[in-house]
């Protein structure tokens, strides 16, 4: 892991970020003391679901738990009280 002074980070941000993007961990220092570590973002591996597990989760999920109640309340409403649309 290399060290970069905050001054160098300020003056050459793009260069330091290129090094990080290339896989290098960079410690940022202020007055010679470490204050932060820049590390490259490592993509998370996706965990694939089997078709059976996916369908099981899909069937068990409800997008909006209150939707049924909201629809029941609105079922009797009309727009007659709004008057004619011109």
UniProtKB/Swiss-Prot annotation:
Stretch forming the signal peptide:
none
Extract the GO molecular function terms from the UniProt entry.
toxic substance binding; toxin sequestering activity
Annotated GO biological process: positive regulation of growth
Q: Which UniProt keywords apply?
A: Toxin-antitoxin system
Superkingdom to which the source organism belongs:
Bacteria
Known partners and oligomeric status? Forms a complex with VapC5.
Family membership, please give it: Belongs to the phD/YefM antitoxin family.
Stated role? Probable antitoxin component of a type II toxin-antitoxin (TA) system. The cognate toxin is VapC5.
Domain-level remarks: The C-terminal domain (residues 55-86) does not neutralize non-cognate antitoxin VapC4; exchanging the N-terminus (residues 1-54) with VapB4 however allows neutralization of VapC4, while exchanging the C-terminal domain (residues 55-86) does not.
Name of the molecule in the record: Putative antitoxin VapB5
Q: Which organism is it from?
A: Mycobacterium tuberculosis (strain ATCC 25618 / H37Rv)
